[in-house]
Amino acid sequence: LPFSVNAELRRAFNEGRVRYTDLNLSDNACQLRQGITGQMDWGIVEACHLERIEGGMVRVYLTAGIGIAPTIFRLAREGVFVELNAWHGHHLMGIHDIYEIEDPWFRSPVLITHPMEKIGRPYVEVPAYRIRGIVHTDLPDEARSMTAPTEVTRRIGANVAEFLRWNMQRGYIYRDKLILQSGVGSGANAVLGALGDSPDVPNFHIYTEVLQEEPLRLIREGRVVSASTGALTISSEHLKEVYQNMDEYRGRLLLRPSEISNCPEIIARLGICSLNTALEVDIYGHVNSTKVCGSRMMNGVGGSADFTNNAMLSIFTCASTAKNGCISSIVPFCSHVDHTEHYVDAIATEYGVADLRGLCATERAEALIAIAHPDYRPILRAYYDLARRNGGHTPHNLRAAFAMHDTYLRKGDMRLTCWEEYL
């Protein structure tokens, strides 16, 4: 299980009741096919329609999330149970592009050169004997509604919009070829909405792993030209609205398996600008996007590394503080690292954008301290001055590197950090 937003599962991960392996989404299906994660006995796949055809085959039309369904149908040793969910109706038929990547070695290229280019079929075709049972349901999806944008997320969105405008002005991004990816969560949803509302950002395409509520609004308004995704992660009310107005989305919306939506080869070829959310960023540009204080799992890395490592321009966004200001999102040293400095191009908070491209370690530190919350800038500056006494290309004081985290765990507020305690 490489990614989950379920609160009960998150508790189980952190309590050790469920063994959880954090994995890039692009690798999940391939590792299953190679047998690295063991044998799959049974599979459960949701569908909106089944069509029996000649030769003892069945066409399975999937619903709003594809994941690794094609691989499950092929690999489940005992077979697959299909949940035939009438709630979805037949609205999504024709929206999918189902294709399984060849396994190594010397596999063929995945020839997608445009976000809406199709290379597969709109269904999964399987032998009828592989379907061991059909369960009829009529249940809406369980995804929650996004929280409303805040002043902080609007400011972050405005800063990212200005940063994109600056890049387009200099020819680093072509206005007529802007393709965005956006990560999961209310913050990412709000930032993408702010970009869509900005006059500085031209109409754009989306190629991403998950599509949330704001991109669908932008499709209706014509700001998003097309959107390719692996899943529609929206509330049942919003999904019902999509189904009722499917003609507005057909031809502009495409659903793919996760190994295609997150395929590094395609991401690099399309020249995507990635937008993902950071839990914390250290002063040299490393990003933690999964573990609170280095230990407690949030949701998993998902596809953020797939996009960050292969995007033409990779941006991470975060509010400068959390927990009513008691936690700084910019710290001396990340308590866990998911994305190293080598792949992180820019960090955006409500106080600005730190463009890290072409900067040495000390220049990165200056740029990132400048966009930290004002309450934390002197604290971070004090650490940086302390670390520089040790010299080196990337100055650190290992006794003090996690002092802000330690102070929060002991006193409940990073602002109470006293560097003298760590000398």
Language model: regions and residue ranges:
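Conserved alpha/beta enzyme-core scaffold
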Residues: L1-L423
